Amino acid sequence: MPSKPESEVLTVAGRELIVSNPRKVFFPERGYTKLDVVEYYVAVADGALRAAGGRPNMLVRYPNGIDGEYFYQKRAPDSRPGWIEVVSLQFPSGRTADEVVPRDAAALAWMANLACLELHPHPVRAEDLDHPDELRVDLDPVPGVGWEQIREVARIVQATLPDFGLVGWPKTSGSRGLHVYVRLERKWTFPEVRRAALALAREVERRAPTLATSKWWKEERHGVFLDYNQNAKDRTVAAAYSIRPKPDARVSAPLGWDEIADCDPQDFTIETMPRRFAKLGDRHADIDRHPCSLAGLLDLSARHEREGLGDAPWPPHYKKQKGEPARVQPSRRRASVHPLIEIGRAQVKADALAGFERWKTRHPEAAAHLEPADVLVDAMRGR
């Protein structure tokens, strides 16, 4: 008779959990197994739950480790234990799905047994799905940008946040960038939080125009991109303590601001983080004690709009938003071959141009943007 697949029984948070294929290698370069992943999340559960607990989580599964195919799973498996909590989440498409809401170390271990290497929580609590309690500042470097520049932009973010009454909590992304989280009072909608994130991105760009950018289109970016769209509904970001699918099994590490200058993303792995956690505890332990108001950033956004800076492009799978600019990258936009203004109904060209000058006097703001090619004097219409 064929032998049964290998498994191991763990007791986590008072619950019995069967880990299937515990010796399966998930990180070939380091030899880390599924059991190593499960034990990592149990070791840092207090911090990981502060980051991802009580929130709907999208499952990101790597059944054959980081070198195999992975997939995103929004719906919680039907075969889940009865003690796994779920909440029904509605997406921008109008569809709904029951997503997993981890509440204890056992739930994290159960997710890890599904080969969920990463924790991808939504920025809302299961008790209030319409009002995010997290502003996520994603510092995403363009190719070729070094770690020192990323840290410099993080320091600018650190200096900017207090000007708007905000407290920031930095962490490594676990990849190339840094994240800064801000806990929010639960009173703003997703569009408002995204609008605030866009205003912050533009303010950081204004303060450091050679280092940072808020431009959505990759061809327009330079330096470090502040990805404001990570705050749109249905977007998730790898949480603090989340493992990342890198050969060295690094993790997203919560930091104190005093650690930014000397830290390196490679310092934090599933091997080193439990030791750090046991020694220092959670560097974000007080994050929930500092919920902040978005009023300052929303005032800045309103000022931007008065100055002509409206909305910026949304991700491609979102419906076209009111006030959103063209969702076409600049190099593919077709230049109009037609003039913006045609001047007619005058038999003499000088009379037509005089009428045009009167129009410019009445509309000085629009006139300031006109180029010579934008104006056509149509003598035929004046006859």
For the regions a protein language model found, what residue spans apply to each?
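C-terminal accessory nucleic-acid interaction domains of nucleic acid-metabolism proteins
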Residues: 1-31, 38, 49, 53-54, ...
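Short, charge-patterned binding micro-sites
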Residues: 56-72, 172-185
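Short, surface-exposed ligand-recognition loops at beta-strand->loop->(often short) alpha-helix junctions
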Residues: 144-146, 343-351
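Short structural boundary motif marking the start of a folded domain
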Residues: 335-341
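Basic, low-complexity intrinsically disordered segments
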Residues: 58, 63-135, 141, 203
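Short beta-strand
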Residues: 59-62, 168-174, 214-218, 376
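Signature for HUH/AEP ssDNA processing cores
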Residues: 100-173, 184-192, 331
